[in-house]
Regions:
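Cys/His-clustered metal-coordination modules, chiefly Zn-binding fingers
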Residues: 133-211
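Short helix-coil boundary/hinge micro-motifs
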Residues: 1-164
Length: 211
């Protein structure tokens, strides 16, 4: 099976969809971004511009290789960011710098900036330093292709409830997702995958128990 057909897009946010291009299949690590063509295919699948909007990609193999490398580095930074948020910590500064590097590569750009809590009243109320998302203007480049993904990651940092950032409850699945359900009780990456398999396994165990 073509590994591109294994792309899934039900994480609830673009950044986590990219993160889910690397996972375990059983005990084997599986990376779905093996070539520049894989990245272009993934971008097209999520409706992001690729070769058509950035001719320098289709006309320059080196630029396509840069795109692959940058996508993989961004994916690793997203992993470190969500792990930090789940641990109730600010993302490492170098991951914020990496996001900002991509966020500023577009005609309409964005940047994560530090908001320092200085007033005694705010400090007494338990308010802590945080990151805020600001708009800036900058020039475009090949990195601009990845800006919507970096923007998605930045919005996870500034807007998402860390409690809602989860990994699938199935022990052999590493999919991340943002739980946007009303109940906040989503456990599975997808009911059609891990959810139904877990229910079937539970039913089989009950049927196998001696009466």
């Amino acid at each position: 099976m073509n590994q591109n057909s294994q792309f899934v897009f039900d994480a609830g946010t673009l950044a986590l969809d990219l993160l889910n291009t690397w996972r375990f299949d059983g005990d084997q690590a599986l990376d779905l971004l093996q070539s520049p063509e894989d990245v272009v295919t993934w971008l097209a699948a999520v409706g992001l511009p690729g070769d058509a909007s950035f001719p320098e990609l289709s006309s320059s193999p080196p630029n396509r290789r840069i795109l692959l490398d940058e996508a993989i580095w961004l994916r690793q930074d997203i992993l470190l960011i969500v792990q930090s948020l789940v641990d109730e910590e600010l993302p490492p500064p170098y991951t914020v710098h990496a996001l900002n590097r991509i966020l500023t590569e577009s005609g309409t750009s964005f940047r994560l900036d530090s908001l320092i809590i200085t007033s005694e009243e705010e400090q007494s109320e338990g308010m802590q330093d945080q990151l805020v998302l600001n708009t800036h203007e900058y020039a475009s480049s090949v990195l601009g292709v990845l800006q919507p993904i970096a923007l998605s990651a930045a919005r996870i940092v500034t807007e998402a409830n860390p409690i809602r950032i989860r990994q699938c409850a199935a022990g052999n699945c590493m999919y991340w997702f943002l739980d946007t359900s009303k109940s906040g009780r989503r456990r599975w990456c997808s009911m059609s995958r891990c959810g139904n398999r877990a229910k079937a396994a539970k039913h089989y165990r009950h049927q196998s128990e001696p009466s």
